[in-house]
Regions:
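C-terminal accessory module of base-excision DNA glycosylases/AP lyases that mediates lesion recognition
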Residues: 1-39, 129-140, 147-217
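Structure-specific DNA junction-binding interface
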Residues: 1-75, 84-98, 104
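Amphipathic alpha-helical segments within well-ordered protein domains
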Residues: 46-51, 64-67, 88, 92, ...
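Short helix-capping/linker segments at secondary-structure and domain boundaries
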Residues: 52-61, 115-121, 160-164, 187-191
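Short, hydrophobic/amphipathic alpha-helical patches that form generic packing surfaces
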Residues: 43-54, 110-113, 155, 213-217
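Alpha-helical ds-nucleic-acid-binding substructure associated with the helix-hairpin-helix region
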Residues: 69-158
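A broad structural signal for alpha-helix termini and local helix breaks/kinks
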Residues: 54, 70, 119, 143, ...
Length: 217
């Protein structure tokens, strides 16, 4: 099977099965939770950071629920009037908003502080009018965001939030457990390493390797 046939098969799979599981177009979030992360760039960033060791719906509903508990969603107020311990306590309060409230409290408070000091309190300034490589580099500077998450963010920003990214060839596939298994079983790569999976995706779809994440997300 040629690369174009593999890509077409994945696109057909996404169209047939992917919509229901899409965090932004499926039924995993309430309308209010979905609208919040799609219209508020800071909520999107918080959801991205929270997407760790929990179900996707738990992570991406967290920003809305945290805002309800805070009574606001101002990055300046979080950075200057709260602490990582206070955020952790809010996350820990039953029903808990995350499996690891302590770590997540530190990550989210740190994100609010960085947004306030470097991006005028608005995450949209991270990805406005810059390349994919710059977006990834900026996102990786935030505690709790790995290269995998930063690559996933680029895909979601383009696919679901309508952010224009010119150099899509620099958006890598997310090194996700499901993708790794499929790539190995399909023989796209021989080893389960970041390097091998990334290079395989670049061979399969050189114009936009990160798109291959989409059918599984």
């Amino acid at each position: 099977m040629e690369n174009k046939d593999i890509l077409n098969a994945l696109q057909n799979y996404e169209m047939t099965f992917g919509t229901a599981e899409n965090i932004f177009s499926g039924g995993l979030l309430t309308d209010a939770e979905r609208d919040f992360v799609m219209r508020d760039s800071n909520a999107f960033l918080f959801g991205l950071i929270a997407d760790q060791s929990v179900k996707a719906e738990t992570a991406w509903s967290l920003p809305y629920k945290l805002a309800q508990r805070l009574g606001h969603f101002s990055m300046q107020k979080i950075a200057k009037e709260s602490s990582s311990e206070e955020i952790g306590t809010l996350l820990r309060t039953k029903p808990a908003l995350h499996r690891y409230p302590g770590n997540m409290g530190r990550y989210l408070w740190s994100a609010a502080e960085r947004l306030t000091s470097e991006y005028d309190g608005c995450a949209e300034n991270i990805w406005g009018n810059v390349t994919a490589m710059e977006i990834v580099e900026r996102l990786e500077a935030f505690s709790g965001i790995s290269h995998k998450k930063a690559s996933l963010a680029c895909l979601l920003l383009w696919r679901d939030l309508g952010v224009e990214i010119s150099d899509k060839e620099n958006i890598d596939i997310a090194y996700d457990v499901h993708i790794r298994r499929i790539f190995l079983r399909a023989g796209f790569c021989e080893k389960d390493t970041l390097k091998d999976v990334t290079e395989a995706a670049r061979r399969l779809n050189p114009k936009f390797p990160g798109y291959l994440t989409s059918p599984f997300w």
